[in-house]
Regions:
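Short beta->alpha connector loops at strand-helix junctions that form conserved
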Residues: 30, 71-72, 88-99, 177, ...
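Rossmann-like dinucleotide-binding domain for NAD(H)/NADP(H)
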Residues: 226, 232-314
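Phosphate-binding beta-alpha-beta segment of Rossmann-like dinucleotide-binding domains, i.e.
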Residues: 86, 94-149
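Rossmann-like dinucleotide/phosphate-binding beta-alpha-beta segment
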Residues: 136-225
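Short glycine-/small-residue-rich Rossmann-like dinucleotide-binding loops
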Residues: 52, 73, 199, 205-207, ...
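An anion/phosphate-binding loop that grips the pyrophosphate of nucleotide cofactors and donors
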Residues: 44, 62, 197-198, 226
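N-terminal glycine-/charge-rich "phosphate-binding" loop or analogous flexible N-terminal tail
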Residues: 1-44
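Rossmann-fold NAD(P) dinucleotide-binding segment
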Residues: 53-65, 210-229
């Protein structure tokens, strides 16, 4: 069995996928460019990947391929309909980061509500505290987390856990119904109503044609000027141009992002550049999922997916 891992550096070097118990060859590449994917995959029975794109045209040229083992939860880099038509199994790993991502979101909430970014940056770049003439200074807003309203968009594993933890902190939690829904399900609140009420909006919905640019100029305009946006879901859920305009013009109070539309971003990405000067914009490099325990769970489950597929033949 020939197994090829196309983007080994997409998971931390400290964690390796356990090798299968059955006879196999295992080849790894740090990363794979689109023009390299076919050549590296053409003789593979199993491809392991996180983000390498497999569309219908490419999959149709890989008659040996039996399984794509995804080292992630999301599968939007794979044409799932084409894989099904061609008899290629696709196995992902849901739920492995159900502790790590919610904890990251909570960290972002506290960072935004207590203006950690601005206060820390002042000390690093301008010695503001040393020259202020007082034991403290309050240049940036500090607001309580307890009592704030959290609007959760996406009530899956991650969104539900974020909501549970937020309630333990004394927050009021609203789960948003789908945009434009004709009926409001029990336990949900109408989409626009959540945007209008929330002090913090956090995104945990999958990326689909419907959710792309879910947060745009129109939806940002519905948010309070004192509200914050958090995105640890998928970059394209947010219109980055509209978000930057909202931040620079005070239409919302701040944002924290773990994902961007293009990853890795270009050096001149406007949001990246803005984060160097704005005290209310926090960007982390898609690491919300990557706690030690989460990555351990991930690599073990990928290995188990491969073992189970070969043992069961499906």
């Amino acid at each position: 069995m020939n197994i090829v891992f196309l983007d080994r550096t997409s998971i931390p070097a400290s964690h390796d996928i356990p090798r299968p118990s059955f006879p196999h060859t295992w080849t790894e590449y740090d990363r794979t460019l689109p023009e390299e994917t076919f050549e590296r995959s053409k003789d593979a029975d199993i491809v392991v990947t996180n983000k390498v794109v497999f569309d219908r045209e490419l999959l149709s040229r890989l008659p040996k391929l039996k399984l794509i083992a995804i080292t992630a939860t999301g599968t939007n880099n794979i044409d799932l309909d084409a894989a099904k038509d061609l008899g290629i199994a696709v196995k992902n790993v849901p739920g492995y980061s159900s502790v790590a991502v919610p904890e990251h979101v909570l960290g972002m909430i506290f960072s935004l509500k207590h203006s950690f970014i601005g206060y820390h940056r002042d000390q690093v770049t301008s010695d503001r505290w040393a020259t202020c003439g007082q034991f403290c200074y309050t240049d940036y807003p500090i607001t309580d987390v307890r009592g704030a309203t959290l609007g959760v968009f996406g009530k899956g594993c991650l969104g539900t856990e974020v909501g549970r933890l937020a309630q333990l902190l004394g927050m009021n939690v609203l789960y948003a119904e789908h945009k434009g829904a004709s009926q409001i399900r029990e336990g949900y609140t109408e989409f626009e109503s959540v945007l209008k009420q929330a002090d913090i909006v956090t995104l945990h919905c999958p990326l689909t044609d419907t959710t792309k640019n879910l947060i745009n100029a129109e939806t940002l305009a519905l948010m309070k000027p004192t509200a914050y946006l958090i995105n640890t879901g998928r970059g394209p859920l947010v219109d980055e141009t509209a978000l930057l305009e909202a931040l620079e013009n005070g239409k919302i109070a701040g944002a924290a992002l773990d994902v961007l539309v293009k990853e890795p971003p270009e050096k001149d990405n406007p949001l990246i550049q803005a984060a160097k000067r704005l005290p209310n914009l926090l960007i982390t490099p898609h690491i919300a999922w990557a706690s030690d325990s989460a990555v351990t769970t991930l690599v073990n489950k990928v290995a188990q997916n491969i073992e189970d597929f070969v043992a069961q033949g499906k």
